[in-house]
């Protein structure tokens, strides 16, 4: 159904991330937030997080990559996640999620960065700028619609939490000591999207979208990509084809 082809292009390790580290937080735990086709948000985002960790460690000179959980059996609280990141003094915190809607046709990306109730970014700043890179690259790579990049207090207008507390709204933005943001990579309540994320290569593609966003934020040239991704369909029936072979000339 989905293919992600890596061409044989050998690149030197990306440099420029030395001295910088990242805390990856795959949202939720175990089998939480079940998708419409039976594949949960928790399992989806864990695999994307692990792929991103592997890409950063193998293809860049990043100092350290931390991750809040490493398997589907762990149950990790919000406090444990943020406390871990604060304890290791991570340079950056990124929380990976997928979204849900009562409308199964809805499928969009969203970035949420820490914001004070007065509209200013929550210090230390950086989440807003990083989110501006991620939202464009993630949306273009997934080829779906987007809600955009928002400060969390501006987004959750139905709640008076920011007004009463000063913000930020999201726990992971409010309780981390480093710049942070949370991403929503489409909707697991969308049948087609939930099926796509069952594919390991699709999740690897999502991880590369985050990797390229990080490089762009740091003004580091991307290596030659050498990757093709897509869904193969029958030209007449438009039905998706499993087990197809793609040839690149």
Regions found by a protein language model. Give the residues of each.
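Active-site-adjacent substrate-binding region
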Residues: 127-164
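N-terminal signal peptide c-region/cleavage motif recognized by signal peptidases
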Residues: 6-9
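A short, glycine/acidic-enriched catalytic loop
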Residues: 29-40, 100-131
């Amino acid at each position: 159904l989905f293919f992600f082809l890596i061409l044989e292009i050998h690149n030197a390790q990306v440099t420029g991330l030395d001295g910088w580290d990242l805390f990856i937080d795959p949202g939720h735990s175990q089998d939480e937030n079940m998708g419409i086709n039976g594949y949960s948000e928790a399992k989806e985002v864990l695999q994307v997080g692990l792929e991103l960790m592997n890409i950063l460690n193998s293809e860049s000179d990043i100092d350290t990559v931390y991750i809040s959980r490493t398997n589907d059996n762990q149950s990790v609280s919000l406090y444990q996640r943020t406390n871990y990141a604060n304890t290791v003094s991570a340079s950056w915190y990124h929380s990976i999620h997928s979204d849900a809607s009562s409308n199964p046709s809805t499928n969009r990306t969203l970035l949420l960065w820490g914001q004070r109730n007065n509209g200013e970014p929550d210090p230390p700043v950086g989440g807003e700028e990083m989110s501006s890179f991620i939202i464009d690259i993630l949306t273009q790579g997934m080829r779906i619609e987007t809600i955009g990049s928002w400060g969390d207090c501006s987004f959750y207008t139905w709640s008076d939490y920011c007004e009463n507390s000063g913000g930020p709204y999201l726990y992971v933005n409010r309780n981390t000591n480093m710049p942070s943001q949370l991403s929503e990579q489409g909707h697991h309540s969308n049948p087609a999207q939930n099926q796509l994320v069952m594919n390991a290569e699709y999740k690897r593609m999502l991880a590369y979208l985050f990797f390229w966003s990080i490089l762009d934020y740091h003004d580091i040239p991307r290596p030659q990509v050498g990757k093709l991704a897509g869904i193969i369909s029958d030209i007449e029936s438009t039905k998706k084809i499993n087990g197809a072979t793609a040839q690149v000339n």
